A protein has these predicted regions:
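Conserved NTP phosphate-binding and transfer environment spanning the P-loop NTPase/kinase superfamily
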Residues: 1-134
Length: 134
């Protein structure tokens, strides 16, 4: 059962003295015209570098409803021309309406999984929901 699977990993993570930090990235986010918003594969290293620096306490971040994310000036844009601050801001914008729909789908899925959904996942879902419905 998926709930047991999640419980296993949450239990394992709780046993670690220094659990790894978890980052999420959507390299494939598209604009209204269906074009990819992130400039491309070669630029992924800019975000990966920020992640490593963030883990080492050397990088800044800004708070969002989803957690911490880099601002435009937090990434190393050396050697990169043509990716404007405005493009980055659009790319990293948190779409509340889309996330409300996504969280509703999560709630449906948790309902299907039943009582075996770990409380920690339900609590996290509640925190995210609160961030978008406050």
């Amino acid at each position: 059962h998926m709930g047991d699977y999640f419980s296993h990993w949450l239990k394992l993570g709780a046993q670690l003295a220094q659990p790894p930090r978890i980052f999420t990235v959507n390299w494939f986010r598209q604009d209204a015209d269906g074009q990819f918003m992130w400039p491309g594969f070669g630029d992924n290293m800019r975000v990966l570098k920020w992640m490593v620096e963030r883990c080492g306490g050397q990088a800044q971040a800004r708070r969002s409803a989803l957690g911490w994310m880099p601002g435009y000036d937090d990434l190393d844009w050396s050697g990169r021309e043509g990716f404007a601050r405005s493009q980055f801001e659009q790319l990293t914008e948190v779409d509340s309406a889309a996330w409300k729909k996504e969280l509703a789908l999560h709630a449906e899925w948790f309902t299907k999984l039943g009582s075996q959904v770990p409380a920690a996942l339900l609590q996290k879902h509640e925190l995210f929901s609160f961030a978008f419905w406050q």
